[in-house]
Amino acid sequence: MRTDYDVIVVGAGHAGCEAACAAARLGSHTLLITIDMNKIAQMSCNPAVGGIAKGQIVREIDALGGQMGIVTDRSSIQFRMLNRSKGPAMWSPRSQSDRQQFILEWRQVLENTPNLYMWQDSVTQFVIEGGVVKGITTALGLTFTSRAVVLTAGTFLNGLMHVGPVKTPGGRVSEPPATGITEQLRDLGFTVGRMKTGTPPRLDERTIDFSQCIRQDGEQDFHHFSFLPGVKSALPQRPCWIVHTNEQVHEVLRKGLPQSPLYNGQITSIGPRYCPSIETKIVTFADKTSHQLFIEPEGATTHEMYLNGFSSSLPWEVQIEALRHIPALRDVHAFRPGYAIEYDCFDPTQLTHTLESKLVKNLFLAGQVNGTTGYEEAAGQGLIAGINAHQNVTGGEPFTLARNEAYIGVLIDDLVTCGVDEPYRMFTSRAEHRILLRQDDADMRLTEKGYGLGLATRERYELMTAKREQIDRLIAYCRQTTVKANAINPLLQANGMQPLTQGQRLHDLLLRPQLNISLIAQALPELRAQLDAIEPARCDEIIEATEVAVKYRGYIERETLIADRVARLDNVTLKGKFDYSQIHQISTEARQKLQAIDPDTVGQASRIPGVSPSDINILLVLLGR
């Protein structure tokens, strides 16, 4: 068996799979090592991918040449585009996935990736010499050497699970924790944190009264995650269901609070603010008499259902008593209880934007070990870490994404610049340039970068350039075409809109919120002919992208100017220029933060909490700007 590799990836969750796949496809001999090979890319919590801002990350991963979008599309049992009622910057794709099919699809991807090897074992130590990582040692007593290591251990570092008073060591139910790594890195100067997450009980759908639920079906249109055509699920589609808690449920939960590990001191670590447990909800929102819950299928053929919104670490008897006060769940049977898990993580400000450690060369960290929460956030980090591990091995240029280029760029910049004091989840509100970071144009933003690296294929690159050309042609046609009033007025009046008094450019006509290209084409045979000339499989995608470009042109152009101005500060290098402890013109807090984080650029420095605009102005003066 081979024992020497270019890159070793520790942990085969969502971050690890993307990291290993990227490094191997770029040409590095890569070892992916995991505690249980039957649980590669396991969805430890909800059986879904995407959602608000998270869906944009998945599309960015796909555009760069990563795999999560493809795997998700192939295992999907329901797809929806969230936030349709808002502007396109907020549209976020989400897929309900078959949990087991998701694992099988990832396993196929990994096993068919050249240069990628897998091994089932637990890593206990890194081999570090002279501040450089050289490999790993395992629980079986084996040593594997490498030029780079990516740590993607998820919730497994000294993981401890809680169901009421019962505490069980583990990174996930039935899987042991990973020990030794935290202690070694702490001794090397890594700042260690402790965080908590949780998961709800799983229910038997045969014991649910669906007549008491609100049905929620998926959408049957052209949207999906991968930009590659023909990537789709062969699985039957399934609905989700909505139910609500009530005061009886809350009363049971309140009586159980003294037994809750969250409220009796058993759990002391910090949980995710935006995914609170049900006991946290009834305490934090004490005035609310009801909370919405989603009953989500775990797969196409299983009876197991996931109760989204009811994460809990209460004793099981309290959980089930509370559930049975929900009308649809009066006779419910459960397959497994909800539980909480505590785990170790590290301060991400001790990383560079490539996710390489500042303390140990060629050691990269990605995923929940950096204090994030969510499959998508982990996968995005894993992709960047895997790319840069390969770049380090081969002497290539570091690969990073700016805040105005990708949500992945926002995510990593937030982590390494601001750090985390609670599990970090991505939202559209975190991206100041979100109108430029839409889900529909991730390929046009990033595929050329992925192709330049060698990660995105020529097929993917040519599809992107063909799409761009078709959009440009359709936009040009809209600008050049004048629509006669008598040709369009019958359609306008039939749809309750003000008729034209004279001809108007098609481009300007499209600015009306009620109008879209497909509707106008019903009255204009020439426009219909333009649409018929587009490849049928991509026509809806081209139309949607064209409408966004036309209707939101002013916003996009304005935001581009703002982003360009901000980017100038990111082009002013700070690294190695100052001993911040000696700059007494800036505030004490700024000195301490700048010394600790050592930002690469003035732009990054300006985003550090505690560094004021006046501090930045002083730095610019000292730089001679």
PLM segments and residue spans:
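Beta1/beta-strand and adjacent pyrophosphate-binding region of the FAD-binding site
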Residues: R2-A15
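Short hydrophobic core segments
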Residues: V10, T143-G154
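A glycine-rich dinucleotide-binding beta-alpha-beta segment and adjacent secondary-structure elements
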Residues: Y306-T372, T400-D413, C539-K593, D598
